[in-house]
Regions:
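Hydrophobic h-region of N-terminal signal peptides that target proteins for export
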Residues: 9-17
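Sec-dependent signal peptide recognition
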Residues: 1-9
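Serine-dependent protease modules
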Residues: 17-203
Length: 203
C-alpha cells in the first residue's frame, strides 16, 4: 500500500510540474505574440566624407592633393511603438544620434521615413515619429516594480534586418546600475542576461 501511495504521489508531482512548465511556456509565447507587432526595425544611414589621395596625382608630381569622396554607411537598431495613434516610437538615442536618414520597417514589411521628436542622451532614449495606419502599440511598464530574478523577454533585430523580431529570454540580473562606463554615463540601468546583440538596441 505504501509503495502504491508513493507511486501515486510521485506521478502527481510530475504531472503538476509538467502542468506548471506548460503554463509558463504558453504565457511566454503569448507575450511574444502580443509584443512582436509593436517592435520595429530601425535602419539608419549617414553620409561620410573621406579624403583619398589620387594615385595619378602622385605620378604627376602632385602627391599632396587629396580627393574627397562621400560614402553612405548603414546601421541597424530596434524600437517599440508606444503610441499607435500618433506614430510614436521609443528607441535608444545612440541608434539615431547624428544620422542623416532614419527608416522604420514594421513586422508586415512596410517601411516609413521617421523624424526625431526628442532625445535624452543621458538616459540614452529617443522618440521617433512615423505617419502610418494600422499599427499596434504596447504599454510601458513600471520599472520600479521589477525584481531581480524575474523573467524577461527581448525582441529585436540582431545583426540583420532579415533576423527581425528575434525573441530571446533571460532574467533580471540587477537593477539600479549606474556609472558603468564613466561618471557621465547613463543612470539606473536594468541588467539582464537575455541575449542582446548588435541590432537589438532600442527593442
Amino acid at each position: 500500500m505504501k509503495i502504491i501511495s508513493y507511486s501515486l504521489l510521485l506521478i502527481n508531482i510530475i504531472f503538476s510540474q509538467n502542468s506548471v512548465v506548460s503554463q509558463f511556456s504558453k504565457a511566454f509565447a503569448d507575450v511574444a505574440e502580443n509584443a512582436k507587432p509593436a517592435v520595429v526595425t530601425i535602419i539608419t544611414d549617414k553620409i561620410v566624407s573621406l579624403n583619398q589621395f589620387d594615385d595619378f596625382g602622385f605620378f604627376f608630381y602632385q602627391p599632396n592633393m587629396p580627393r574627397q569622396r562621400e560614402f553612405k554607411t548603414n546601421a541597424l537598431g530596434s524600437g517599440v511603438i508606444v503610441d499607435a495613434k500618433n506614430g510614436y516610437i521609443l528607441t535608444n538615442n545612440h541608434v539615431v544620434d547624428d544620422m542623416d536618414g532614419i527608416k522604420i520597417k514594421l513586422i508586415d514589411k512596410r517601411e516609413f521615413e521617421a523624424t526625431i521628436i526628442g532625445t535624452d542622451p543621458k538616459t540614452d532614449l529617443a522618440v521617433l515619429k512615423i505617419d502610418a495606419d494600422e499599427i499596434e502599440d504596447i504599454g510601458l511598464g513600471d520599472s520600479d516594480e521589477i525584481r531581480v530574478g524575474e523573467w524577461v523577454m527581448a525582441v529585436g533585430s540582431p545583426f540583420s534586418e532579415n533576423l527581425s523580431h528575434t525573441v530571446t529570454t533571460g532574467i533580471i540580473s540587477a537593477i539600479g546600475r549606474s556609472n558603468i562606463l564613466n561618471s557621465g554615463s547613463y543612470e539606473d540601468f536594468i541588467q539582464t542576461d537575455a541575449a542582446i546583440n548588435p541590432g537589438n538596441s532600442g527593442g
